[in-house]
């Protein structure tokens, strides 16, 4: 049964030795199994199905540096129970008053939420959420919705000032997070990552599960806008000016 299989995977016994490599590598060895290997960039997907709700969180399955991870692209303004407004926007899950009080640069708020705040730009929020969670990880804070909704670059700058005695502006804090994210992405590119791997399993694009399949053009348009926001080419390689602005020339020298 399942309990025995888990033990086989842990001890690499029999088929457990194959499955211990993860579903991507296992599917390459098990005939006709690839349609059932639900992963992005080799990481198995969490329980949330993007056919039910296409939003910042599910775009993050494609964009984040680990692959199909549910902890790197959580929006601080998500609305879990409502639908999507289109390939590029989702409904706002917090009040206008809450948005105005968020710890986020004002220009970024307008770009993501509009003025007055009415909706959420999925690609722009994906970039911001990734950098916010990068800060949370770097500062050793737990990633929970209350933290996402209350912590931001201003607070993190004050925390750093309290510890090291240096006043760090919110813009500098976000730039550091962007540098970390791009450094991880450059590592992946160096190790062979290609734009073609920013792709959901075909079943999400072909099969109806009570929700219609996602349209591939929806996914691709969101990815295109995300790459623009990141300062990347459409093949997911950072532009020279982005590399220069982040001081990552040495790390990007392999490109």
Residue ranges and their predicted role:
Residues 1-255:
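Extended C-terminal regions of large enzymes
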